[in-house]
Amino acid sequence: MIELGVNIDHVATLRQQRHTAYPDPVQAALRAEDAGADLITLHLREDRRHIQDADVYAIRPLLRTRMNLECAVTPEMLEIACAVKPSDVCLVPEKRTELTTEGGLDVAGAQAAVTDAVQLLAEAGIRVSLFIDPDARQIEAAARAGAPVIELHTGAYAEARDDAAVQAELARVRAAVAEGLRHGLRVNAGHGLHYGNVQAVAALDGIAELNIGHAIVAQSIFDGWDKAVRDMKALMVQARLAAVRGHA
């Protein structure tokens, strides 16, 4: 069944706004697991704008599920990842001026560096994912780099405003899923997904995992953290089951 990775970055964003000790991302991670999260995702950025090094080290030994650590392809971040040894590392692009990750990693344009990073992490026993746009060229480059997993950037789908654009972007994601599977890759997806748009993506056969954070944190203000996580997971599972029944 499709899995939910709960991204806790914006729990840390709220904390860092006042440099307080609360809300605690560790507590958010453990509560998310209790509410049905299949893994916990967190992004240690170079600018440390939300998740801090201490969060990563504190959360890692406490999780009962998987830790998916997002980080840039830099010596510092790769060193931290190898020290922490999460089950998964997702390599992502970073710009200091961006509000959130603006696009996928250009694997094709940095083939050697990404390949070296994938090999380094794999030798440390870490499964590597590459966060890329739903583009055949990038998928092929990810396969050449030796990454066993890709995460498709769903931002363009999430930002599409009219039905024609939504359907076009969804078709693009669907084609990318098929291309990833053709290369023997595990295919995940995420970015910009929320309670109103997640089901169309969750219904796509071949997507193993969705990573979602901002929408869950936002909804938790009104519904509470546990319910926000449970409701997102329920939407995903319902969509996948309906799709399976439709194909039967």
Curated annotation (Swiss-Prot):
Catalysed reaction equations from the record: 3-amino-2-oxopropyl phosphate + 1-deoxy-D-xylulose 5-phosphate = pyridoxine 5'-phosphate + phosphate + 2 H2O + H(+)
Biological process according to GO: pyridoxine biosynthetic process
Pathway annotation: Cofactor biosynthesis; pyridoxine 5'-phosphate biosynthesis; pyridoxine 5'-phosphate from D-erythrose 4-phosphate: step 5/5
EC number annotated for this UniProt entry: 2.6.99.2
Superkingdom of origin: Bacteria
A cellular component annotation (GO) from this entry: cytosol
Record localization: Cytoplasm
Residues noted as binding 1-deoxy-D-xylulose 5-phosphate in the record, renumbered to the chain: 9-10, 45, 50, 100
Keywords: Cytoplasm, Pyridoxine biosynthesis, Transferase
Record's keyword annotation contains rRNA processing: no
Site (Transition state stabilizer): 151
Positions annotated to bind 3-amino-2-oxopropyl phosphate: 7, 18, 192, 213-214
Xref: InterPro entries: Aldolase_TIM, PyrdxlP_synth_PdxJ, Pyridoxine-5'_phos_synth
Principal place of residence: cytoplasm
Catalytic machinery residues: 43 (proton acceptor), 70 (proton acceptor), 191 (proton donor)
Record's subunit section: Homooctamer; tetramer of dimers.
UniProt-listed NCBIfam families: pdxJ (TIGR00559), PRK05265.1-1 (NF003623), PRK05265.1-3 (NF003625), PRK05265.1-5 (NF003627)
Role, per record: Catalyzes the complicated ring closure reaction between the two acyclic compounds 1-deoxy-D-xylulose-5-phosphate (DXP) and 3-amino-2-oxopropyl phosphate (1-amino-acetone-3-phosphate or AAP) to form pyridoxine 5'-phosphate (PNP) and inorganic phosphate.
Family: Belongs to the PNP synthase family.
PANTHER family linked: PYRIDOXINE 5'-PHOSPHATE SYNTHASE
Protein name according to UniProt: Pyridoxine 5'-phosphate synthase
Naturally occurring in which organism (per UniProt): Bordetella pertussis (strain Tohama I / ATCC BAA-589 / NCTC 13251)
